Design a protein with these regions (language model features):
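Active-site entrance/lid segments in N-terminal catalytic domains of soluble metabolic enzymes
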Residues: 1-162, 166
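Conserved active-site-proximal phosphate/metal-binding subdomains
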Residues: 146-168, 174-312
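Active-site metal-binding loops of divalent metal-dependent hydrolases
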Residues: 20, 172-173
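Conserved acidic functional residues
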Residues: 116, 171-172
Length: 312
């Protein structure tokens, strides 16, 4: 399949692996790229020199294109960007911030820039900033989301109607059926997170991977909107948040409860009780942990078969 996304990134399939914190290390990114998609290293949970190590290992593991995802709220973002430049990364996805801040700088270094958005307003701002493509993420997605709570199903056609750059759909996509639906809605490609988190190549703890398999519809919820909206599993930590909400908490009280390293505790260390378990709604269709290569093949084969059936 050839389209604007495969041509932009020089990849075989218009499938991008989300750059998830504590999940998307060099092993996952290189495996996705080797299988024909675009792998992303998630820099949001890495110190600059740790990111450098992951980039160098990824280069050794694949000769295919790969990228780095950088949340712009990261406190050492200048240092991360310096590492990205020094290591010759050619694709950068940015999120959680103003795309104007880094887009021109990166593009002047001949880097392809993609920004993650959650609304038409932010999509237009990203296009104006000069990004090469946008990821439109519906609030079905695990982890941090936009406050608008727009679903992928509604967001993609609304954005596609307004912008003239490639659109990548994210949130609630985990198989060929979801990919086909997103592209019928107007997406040029898809970004997939939770499905790739449940792989042997993912950096996540085995407890977290098993939780992805156990999650059913209704087991996750978007919360902490006063801080940074996040979709997580309804575990003990989530229940503590809800109990605090009953007392009309201040932002500071919510921050105190959140504390530090909650995501690391849940995703990387496997604490299913007190950790922040960032998992998307699509987990309800993920039933086993299988290698990245098999997932890509399954998604592409199902996509092609369903497309033929759909066209009949």
């Amino acid at each position: 399949m050839t389209n604007t996304i495969t041509q932009l990134f020089k990849i075989k399939h218009p499938i991008i692996q989300g750059g998830m914190v504590w999940v998307s290390g060099w092993k996952l990114a290189s495996a996705v790229s080797n299988a024909g998609g675009l792998g992303l290293i998630g820099a949001g949970s890495m110190y600059p020199e740790v990111l450098r190590e992951h980039i160098q290992k990824c280069k050794k593991a694949t000769n295919k294109p790969f990228g780095v995802n950088v949340p712009m709220l990261y406190p050492q973002i200048d240092a991360l960007m310096n590492v990205i430049i020094e290591e010759g990364v050619t694709i950068v996805f940015t999120s959680a911030g103003n795309p104007k801040t880094w887009t021109s700088f990166l593009k002047n270094k001949s880097i392809i820039v993609v920004h993650v958005v959650s609304s038409v307003k932010f999509a237009l701002k990203a296009e104006l900033a000069g990004v090469d493509a946008i990821v439109c993420e519906g609030f079905e997605a695990g982890g941090h989301n936009g406050r608008e709570e727009s679903t992928t199903f509604t967001l993609i056609p609304m954005v596609k109607e307004q912008v003239n750059i490639p659109v990548i759909a994210a949130g609630g996509i985990g198989n060929g059926r979801g990919m086909l639906a997103a592209m019928v809605l107007g997406a040029d490609g898809v970004q997939i997170g939770s499905r790739f988190a449940a792989t042997p190549e993912s950096s996540a703890h085995t407890n977290f991977k098993q939780t992805i398999l156990d999650v059913k519809d209704g087991d996750t919820h978007l919360t902490l909107k006063e801080l940074a909206p996040v979709r997580l599993v309804k575990n003990k930590f989530y229940k503590e948040i809800q109990e605090l909400y009953q007392k009309n908490p201040t932002r500071e009280e919510l921050k105190d409860l959140l504390g530090r390293a909650r995501a690391k505790k849940g995703i990387f260390e496997g604490d299913l009780v007190n950790g922040e378990l960032e998992i998307g709604q699509i987990a309800g269709i993920i039933h086993k942990i299988i290698p990245v290569k098999e997932i890509l093949e399954e998604i592409v084969n199902d996509f092609e078969a369903l497309k033929k059936s759909f066209l009949k």
